[in-house]
């Protein structure tokens, strides 16, 4: 049996303020830090151990991982940071309050942007200061790989190369994998692992800071999965 544990980062400052966050690099709230420590404590008390961890290049996920590692006494754990695990890029909606956006554009339109599998939000302009190409952490990426806005379908297509090239081989080598990322990058993996339809995955919500345990067979097909809380 192969072990994969997925954790969405703890509450962030913009979760608290009800803002579209995406690739904006906001930090955890004190509550988010507590959620992350609690996740690590749950895993430690349940007897989980890990050989490698994966996370994004955004601080709310990285710091969540640090807290989990600290609670489990696993600060030495090898960590792979990848932009492919970043949150879905919300384009021109980045930083906007969700309620105010709904008041401006209408609830139905915002619901479509948030919950349609293959409809992107309004894209950033190339010269927008929020364009990730202006951020040094993405300097080595091809500009064509840097999104100006994404739907969940784009997010799935971004995450799967990392799964195929790194995470899946690690699992097949019997490494116990911890992955700390974001709501939509985790939903992308859930969709792939559980072979969910485009419609079904849109109804899935991933809570902050609660470990989602996948037990997989030798072909990396789910035997069972459950939240540990």
From Swiss-Prot:
Amino-acid positions noted as binding substrate in the UniProt annotation, renumbered to this chain: 8-15, 21-22, 60, 87-90, 98, 114-115, 183-184
Single annotated GO MF: phosphoglycerate mutase activity
Keyword entries, A-Z: Gluconeogenesis, Glycolysis, Isomerase
Domain of life: Bacteria
EC number annotated for this UniProt entry: 5.4.2.11
Site, Transition state stabilizer: residue positions: 182
Pfam families reported in the protein's UniProt record: His_Phos_1 (PF00300)
tRNA-binding listed as a keyword: no
Gene Ontology biological process: gluconeogenesis; glycolytic process
Pathway where it operates: Carbohydrate degradation; glycolysis; pyruvate from D-glyceraldehyde 3-phosphate: step 3/5
Task of the protein: Catalyzes the interconversion of 2-phosphoglycerate and 3-phosphoglycerate.
Family named by the database record: Belongs to the phosphoglycerate mutase family. BPG-dependent PGAM subfamily.
PANTHER family: PHOSPHOGLYCERATE MUTASE
Database matches in NCBIfam families: pgm_1, PRK14115.1
Cited HAMAP family: PGAM_GpmA (MF_01039)
Summary of subunit composition and partner proteins: Homodimer.
Record's protein name: 2,3-bisphosphoglycerate-dependent phosphoglycerate mutase
Gene this chain is encoded by: gpmA
